[in-house]
């Protein structure tokens, strides 16, 4: 099917979904969860093809891990779908209302956005996350996954479409571009006659390409250098535990710590302790000249180059820099692409407020790890993306962020004076 026809079919499906009840949508989601379990062997077999192709192509172990589905991960995906069922449906909710002097009762009511195009890389669970959130909010979706998970995604979408048809909902509510030709991405970005929003999920290059080539509004997010600033007043022992969590728990995540900024007055105490912990975790350190002597015992240490503090590591590598105060920390963050998740560790309330107000990040933390920026952790259920832009949505995008609103006026045959 051509993209033009996919767009037409998605638009028609979106019209139908806009009038579907919450109960109908939940039944479809339950059918998807049931069918994922029933067809687990086919899904895992398809994923094995992707893993074998990835190994043959020389993909790193970290990338192969992102591609991998196994029984435990598939069970987690099923659990996520069932959790979406339990979440409140925002569609139809009244945001606010008032009665005008002329008697018109005016309200704002949440509605689906329409058709959402999602371009993503690697993780096959994203296919189910996006489809389930879009369905719950009455949106149709056109998905374009990475070639690395081609077989997995095809099988997952077959499961979704089968469950939709069995539930009496249009199969075309979730469609997958099954041609790996990259030219089709550009074609999707220009399908503004049918597609209402584009969500890219991947690296900085993908986001840049979508932003520059799309005639459709694009949600920019997922990329950003994550910082922790250790202030002069911080509890250093407890700070080490937070730094360890932010860097090591899942280093390939977009909310993992990239750059550690340390107040110069506590650096001589903190950094030697950090070295032992990072050696144990096999973390490579990249440091500015003034920090190098304090990190001398590190197993892996090199001087920072011009690009290092602009690098989203997605691995066991950590940049380290000394700063004079919270203002210098904020200045560094502005210069080096902060925008996703950043934190201050401090016992000084004024500095905490200065950091929260001055950081331009989608999520800012005081005395907490950057790893909390996640739809599940925020109580939003699964997320479709983490937006780092100012307009429409910011931070983890859950159900509410996949809706718009319409004005509804109720009256008794009222005419304008």
UniProtKB/Swiss-Prot annotation:
GO molecular function: glutamate-5-semialdehyde dehydrogenase activity; NADP binding
Keyword Oxidoreductase part of the UniProt annotation: yes
One Pfam assignment: Aldedh
UniProt entry keywords in alphabetical sequence: Amino-acid biosynthesis, Cytoplasm, NADP, Oxidoreductase, Proline biosynthesis
Family assignment from sequence similarity: Belongs to the gamma-glutamyl phosphate reductase family.
Species name: Aeromonas hydrophila subsp. hydrophila (strain ATCC 7966 / DSM 30187 / BCRC 13018 / CCUG 14551 / JCM 1027 / KCTC 2358 / NCIMB 9240 / NCTC 8049)
InterPro entries (UniProt xref): Ald_DH/histidinol_DH (IPR016161), Ald_DH_C (IPR016163), Ald_DH_N (IPR016162), Aldehyde_DH_dom (IPR015590), G-glutamylP_reductase_CS (IPR020593), Glu-5-SA_DH (IPR012134), GPR_dom (IPR000965)
Catalytic activity, as annotated: L-glutamate 5-semialdehyde + phosphate + NADP(+) = L-glutamyl 5-phosphate + NADPH + H(+)
Its EC number(s): 1.2.1.41
Name of protein: Gamma-glutamyl phosphate reductase
Signal peptide coordinates: none
Role description: Catalyzes the NADPH-dependent reduction of L-glutamate 5-phosphate into L-glutamate 5-semialdehyde and phosphate. The product spontaneously undergoes cyclization to form 1-pyrroline-5-carboxylate.
GO biological process: L-proline biosynthetic process
Cellular component terms per the entry's GO annotation: cytoplasm
Broad class of enzyme this protein falls into: oxidoreductase
Subcellular location: Cytoplasm
Major subcellular location class: cytoplasm
Residues passing through the membrane, by range: none
Pathway: Amino-acid biosynthesis; L-proline biosynthesis; L-glutamate 5-semialdehyde from L-glutamate: step 2/2
